[in-house]
């Protein structure tokens, strides 16, 4: 795989691949939520987080007053609570997590001290849809930190038993919570595995599901679950493939599809699935483009679009992809060109158009997060 120079390179890329461009969409009172939302972008090399007001109509980015905002040491992943009151950023070199209050009038953010301890080199965050628990992948300590979230203050409290182990040398770089909030899936960048955990109801305690971990391709760098919770998709950055596994909703167990893995672009590192579960978008770090696939709702098989023809050009070294809450736009964070590409999504065909630069951010972005409408 071009441009990946050992694990250090992979981790540095995850900062880019975890480009938590936390797109805070709609739902911000006083922000004319019917016409705009807010996007938050992590900029680890400048220890800051950029914020933009985004048009729901055109997808145009306009910098929020005061942006970029000071963050922790190398913030590379950001998520928002469902009420859009709080933002959380994983600080890779600080080994901690920052909590920010979101100003509902301006979209600005202010950090609440002290920061919360994490494992060694937290590089990815995920939250359940209820906003009850926050999960952090610690790449250097090969474990998962789990926190309960105070709905009133946003303060994090580590749950009993946290951090939870993966395997020695697993180097987890990506994780996602299933839509039901019952399961957590974690990608091991070094072992070619996905770990599956059940999430204790009310406790957040993790327990590996039967037969976990599950074998995927080489260098898994992103993991996603379809909205119906039938399939798990994994972007394998070193083998240029996408693994697809069926999900047993009663146990959380995964079973690889017969013809999996499927051919992808060059160095796929980030994925986004539309809310209807019809289309899958994959940022290809080495190809400087985005691949688009239609998804068979029955079999889970991805088929790359031919009309319009995939892949679609992005910026230089696209590391993160996300769909905004309107479902109309795909935003891609580009590491080397230091910008965000914006695409219009055709809801009928899944095709992408425009692809122009929505915003220049000055330093390498590493993740995008969006609010719910």
Question: What do these predicted regions represent?
Answer:
Residues 4-20:
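Bacterial N-terminal signal peptides that target proteins for export
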Residues 27-373:
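Predominantly soluble domains enriched in secretory-pathway, periplasmic, or organellar proteins
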């Amino acid at each position: 795989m071009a441009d990946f120079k050992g694990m250090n390179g992979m981790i540095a890329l995850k900062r880019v691949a975890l480009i938590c461009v936390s797109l805070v969409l709609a739902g911000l009172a006083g922000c004319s939520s019917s016409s705009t939302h807010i996007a938050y972008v992590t900029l680890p090399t400048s220890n800051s987080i950029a914020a933009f007001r985004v048009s729901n109509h055109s997808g145009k980015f306009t910098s929020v007053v005061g942006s970029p905002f000071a963050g922790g040491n190398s913030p590379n992943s950001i998520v928002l609570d469902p009420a859009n009151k709080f933002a959380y950023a994983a600080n890779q070199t600080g080994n901690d997590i920052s909590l920010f209050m979101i100003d509902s009038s301006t979209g600005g953010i202010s950090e609440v001290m002290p920061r919360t301890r994490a494992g060694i080199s937290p590089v990815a965050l995920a939250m359940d849809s209820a906003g009850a628990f926050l999960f952090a992948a610690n790449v250097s300590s090969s474990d998962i930190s789990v926190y309960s979230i105070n709905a009133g203050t946003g303060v994090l409290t580590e749950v009993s038993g946290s951090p939870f182990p993966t395997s020695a040398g697993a180097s987890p770089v990506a994780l996602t919570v299933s839509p039901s909030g019952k399961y957590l899936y974690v990608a091991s960048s070094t072992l070619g595995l996905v770990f599956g955990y059940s999430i204790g109801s009310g406790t957040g305690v993790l327990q590996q599901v039967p037969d976990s971990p599950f074998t995927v391709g080489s260098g898994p760098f992103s993991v996603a679950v379809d909205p119906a919770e039938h399939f798990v998709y994994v972007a394998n950055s070193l083998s240029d493939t996408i693994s697809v596994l069926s999900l047993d909703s009663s146990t959380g167990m995964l079973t690889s599809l017969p013809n999996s893995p499927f051919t992808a672009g060059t160095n796929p590192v980030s994925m986004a699935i539309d809310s209807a579960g019809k289309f899958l978008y994959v940022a290809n770090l080495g190809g400087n483009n985005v691949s688009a696939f239609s998804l068979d709702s029955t079999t889970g098989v991805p088929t790359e679009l031919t009309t319009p023809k995939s892949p679609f050009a992005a910026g230089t070294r696209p590391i993160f992809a996300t769909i905004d809450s309107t479902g109309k736009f795909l935003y891609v964070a580009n590491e080397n060109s230091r910008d965000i590409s914006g695409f219009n999504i055709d809801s009928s065909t899944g095709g992408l158009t425009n692809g122009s630069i929505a915003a220049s951010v000055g330093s390498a972005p590493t993740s995008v997060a969006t609010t719910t409408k």
